[in-house]
Every structure is written in C-alpha cells, then in structure tokens.
UniProtKB/Swiss-Prot annotation:
Manner of cofactor binding, per the entry note: Binds 1 zinc ion.
MF-aspect GO terms: zinc ion binding
Name of this protein: Protein SprT
Organism: Pectobacterium atrosepticum (strain SCRI 1043 / ATCC BAA-672) (Erwinia carotovora subsp. atroseptica)
Disulphide-bridged cysteine pairs: none
Gene name linked to the record: sprT
Family the UniProt entry places it in: Belongs to the SprT family.
GO CC, any one term: cytoplasm
Highest classification ranks of the organism: Bacteria, Pseudomonadati, Pseudomonadota, Gammaproteobacteria, Enterobacterales
SMART domains: SprT (SM00731)
Residue sites binding Zn(2+) per the record: 78, 82
Top-level taxon in the UniProt lineage: Bacteria
Residues of the SprT-like domain: 22-163
C-alpha cells in the first residue's frame, strides 16, 4: 500500500507531540523507551492503531488532516500509551486500568477510548439494519459476517437482533 502524502508541518507536529510525550514518560517512569515508528497507513474510521510487537503507531492521514490539532493532542498520546503499557506491563486489557493510568498519570491526557471525529469522508458503504427501536448502519465487513451466518448483532438499547433492511439497500 502506498503511504499517503502528509504535509510536512502535520508530520512535524505529530512527531513533536510524540517525542514530548515519550520524553515525559521516560522521565516519569525512569526508563529509556525508544521512539516508535510512525506511518500514515491507517484506513477507515479508525484514527490510529498501536502495533505492539513492531513498536509502531499507524495514523489515519485523512482524519489527521481534517482534525489536525485535536487529532494530535488526543490520538498520538492514546496510541503511544498502548505501546508504553505493553512495554511496561505486557499484554493487558487494551483500555484497562494500566492504560488509563498511563494516559492520566504519566502522559497527563484524558483517557478517552474513542474519538469523536466526523467520519463521513472515510466511511465506506454501510448497510441499514433495523431492530424494534431504531436504524443501525453496519459496515460491509459486519454485513458480510451476518450474510455468511458467522454472527448476529443486537441493539444495545432494546436487545433485539438486527434485521437487514433490504428495501433501503436497493
């Protein structure tokens, strides 16, 4: 996959944040963790992922450009925290107490599990499903899993199994 072109100023801002937070963590934890690799190959509605064994952070270039400073302030420390937790504690719950501690007490960033960015520009085709109380939009991956009989999804509000709304897909 080709690496998308990121404006140099955006990349520099990402790296400045990453280096500042890493230095802060190394001082607080009295460690010398190395700088992780950063790539801009994350796709879809996911803002970023931490690849633990590769010591790499993958960021979504579209969401970075659309939400610049908020993205840098929230997503970069979020993914760095995953790497630091893995290095310090090994395999633990992704957003568990160790991760929350790392975010709040070491990196001094609010521990938010998910971003609130608009994702219309990066969201792929969705399929409408219904329950007894509302409409749900499922990604193509989830829709295909339902079609193959691998899973079924339930509404969090009413608890009913979601049904594909064939009329809206025509």
């Amino acid at each position: 996959m080709n690496t998308p072109r990121i404006p140099i100023a955006s990349h520099q801002a990402v790296m400045r944040c990453l280096r500042d937070k890493l230095q802060q963590a190394n001082l607080t934890l009295q460690t010398d963790y190395t700088e992780p690799a950063v790539s801009y190959q994350q796709r879809g509605a996911t803002a970023g992922t931490a690849w633990l064994q590769h010591w790499e952070i993958r960021l979504n270039p579209v969401l970075l450009q659309e939400n610049q400073q908020t993205f840098i302030d929230e997503v970069v420390p979020h993914e760095l925290a995953h790497l630091l937790v893995y290095a310090r504690f090994g395999r633990v719950a992704p957003h568990g107490k160790e991760w929350r501690w790392m975010m709040e007490n070491v990196l001094h960033v609010p521990a938010k599990r998910t971003h609130r960015f608009a994702v219309q520009s990066v969201q792929g085709k969705t399929f409408t499903y219904l329950c007894d109380c509302q409409r749900h939009e499922l990604t193509i991956r989830r829709h295909n899993r339902v079609l193959r009989g691998e899973t079924e999804y339930r509404c969090r509000r009413c608890g009913k199994t979601l049904r594909h709304d064939v009329k809206s897909s025509i």
